[in-house]
């Protein structure tokens, strides 16, 4: 199938907006959504990301004006190769850490290279999250959509060109991309190979966190989120359309590109965000604030203040707290923490936590800075200090994350992770305060 040449990429700015875009002038109907005859002979189609009757502030839906309706497809057949078919592992309360996963030697496109790491709900549930590491060394020729949830992509190696139904966006390490549930897309590799992390959100769509006493500005600012403008492919010829449904890959063959949306308007859109634009908040007096101040996006639950999933980053920042143990404190958490590292080093781990690696601390798993970090922090001169050239992140969820069997059996699982705390000394002296 012949594709259009790469367009000059343009974006719409904002988060949660009611956007509108057209690749041909006048392709958007005026004053209504579904006219008897749409402009240019297009078909009108609605893509719903939430229930019809959600509050307007939470509603996600987009009207698409396309060359052929999505209903024009044959029967889906289950693919023989099921890369995500492995079960969750047995109950395991231990702290876990993985070295970086290698890029496969055999040709592997974006959807073939997902390694399941952990999950806390089946895809049929209206809540929860599944976490993967993706690895790829060839661009996709087929098109994919995920019926199981919204996808948050966190590249660690390699730039991605993501062609979606609504337009094209390019994402590099230190940027993220979010693709709504059910939206068709294709991932092309701009650097030959790629690796990164995926959070598959089965719950409420991601949104910006409330700022509370921080005020009307700070953290991730809405204007820095970018949604691609309309771009369509008018191509004849066979293309495989793959869907992920309840964790399995099913496919059919089309005789046209399904990325044929000429115009669209709505709020259920793909977007990208540059993590370097995050307005980091921290103390200017004493103590280390809770890591919730680093939240970029959140998927809420019905319990106010408890997240189905938070996406949290630990970016470059100044440390100026006086009379304070500056690394993240020792902690036992109600929430479950899956961490990854995009570049640099994480300030709570001197060794062993590498870019492309991961860690999992389940509910009430005791964790904190390793022995080397702790020793240095207690003895440090508390002059202002900048943590630079780093970007760690966390997928945090209120439901227990169970590691996959593949993650527990892979050679990258570090058997000696607990040893990073083993040399923490007892410095208690009841005779000296």
Swiss-Prot record:
Keyword presence, Repressor? no
Name any GO cellular component annotation.
protein-DNA complex
Which coenzyme or cofactor does it need?
Fe cation
- State how activity varies with temperature: Optimum temperature is 37 degrees Celsius.
Q: Where is the active site?
A: 288
The record's keywords, sorted A to Z, are: Dioxygenase, Iron, Metal-binding, Oxidoreductase, Phenylalanine catabolism, Tyrosine catabolism
Instruction: Specify the pathway.
Output: Amino-acid degradation; L-phenylalanine degradation; acetoacetate and fumarate from L-phenylalanine: step 4/6
Show the GO MF annotations. Answer: DNA-binding transcription repressor activity; homogentisate 1,2-dioxygenase activity; iron ion binding; transcription cis-regulatory region binding
In terms of domain of life, where is this protein from? Bacteria
Under catalytic activity, the entry for this protein gives:
homogentisate + O2 = 4-maleylacetoacetate + H(+)
What family name appears in the similarity comment?
A: Belongs to the homogentisate dioxygenase family.
Assembly, in brief, is: Hexamer; dimer of trimers.
Official protein name in the record: Homogentisate 1,2-dioxygenase
| Species whose genome carries this gene | Pseudomonas putida (strain ATCC 47054 / DSM 6125 / CFBP 8728 / NCIMB 11950 / KT2440)
């Amino acid at each position: 199938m012949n594709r259009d040449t790469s367009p000059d990429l343009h974006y719409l700015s904002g988060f949660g907006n009611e956007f509108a875009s057209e690749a041909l002038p006048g392709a958007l109907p005026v004053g209504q959504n579904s006219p008897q005859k749409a402009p240019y002979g297009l078909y009108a189609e609605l893509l719903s990301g939430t229930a019809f009757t959600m509050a307007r502030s939470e509603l996600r839906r987009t009207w698409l004006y396309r060359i052929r309706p999505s209903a024009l497809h044959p029967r889906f057949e289950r693919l023989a190769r099921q890369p995500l078919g492995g079960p969750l592992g047995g109950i395991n309360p231990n702290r876990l850490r993985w070295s970086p996963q290698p890029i496969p030697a055999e040709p592997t496109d974006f959807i073939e290279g997902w390694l399941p790491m952990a999950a806390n709900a089946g895809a049929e549930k209206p809540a929860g999250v599944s976490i993967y590491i993706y690895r790829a060394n060839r661009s996709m020729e087929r098109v994919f959509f995920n019926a199981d949830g919204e996808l948050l992509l966190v590249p660690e190696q390699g730039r991605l060109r993501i062609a979606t139904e609504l337009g094209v966006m390019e994402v590099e390490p230190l940027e993220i991309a979010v693709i709504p549930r059910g939206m068709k897309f294709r991932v092309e590799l701009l650097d030959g190979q790629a690796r990164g992390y995926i959070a598959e959100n089965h719950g409420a769509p991601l949104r910006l966190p409330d700022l509370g006493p921080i005020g009307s500005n700070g953290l991730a600012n809405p204007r820095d989120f970018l949604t691609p403008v309309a771009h369509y492919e008018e191509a004849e010829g066979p293309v495989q359309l793959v869907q992920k449904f309840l964790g399995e890959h099913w496919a059919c063959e089309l005789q046209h590109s399904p990325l044929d949306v000429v115009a669209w308007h709505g709020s259920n859109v793909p977007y990208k965000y540059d993590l370097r634009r995050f307005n980091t908040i921290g103390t200017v007096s004493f103590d280390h604030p809770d890591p919730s101040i680093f939240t970029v996006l959140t998927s809420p639950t019905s319990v106010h203040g408890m997240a189905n999933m938070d996406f949290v980053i630990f970016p470059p920042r100044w440390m100026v707290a006086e009379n304070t143990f500056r690394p993240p404190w020792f902690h036992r958490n109600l929430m479950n923490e899956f961490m990854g590292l995009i570049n640099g080093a994480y300030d709570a781990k001197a060794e062993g936590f590498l870019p492309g690696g991961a860690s999992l601390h389940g509910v009430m798993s005791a964790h904190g800075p390793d022995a080397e970090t702790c020793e240095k922090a207690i003895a440090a001169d508390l002059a202002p200090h900048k943590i630079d050239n780093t970007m760690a992140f966390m997928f945090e969820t209120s439901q227990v994350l169970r590691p996959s069997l593949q993650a527990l059996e892979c050679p990258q699982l570090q058997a000696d992770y607990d040893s990073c705390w083993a040399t923490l000394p007892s410095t208690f002296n009841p005779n000296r305060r």
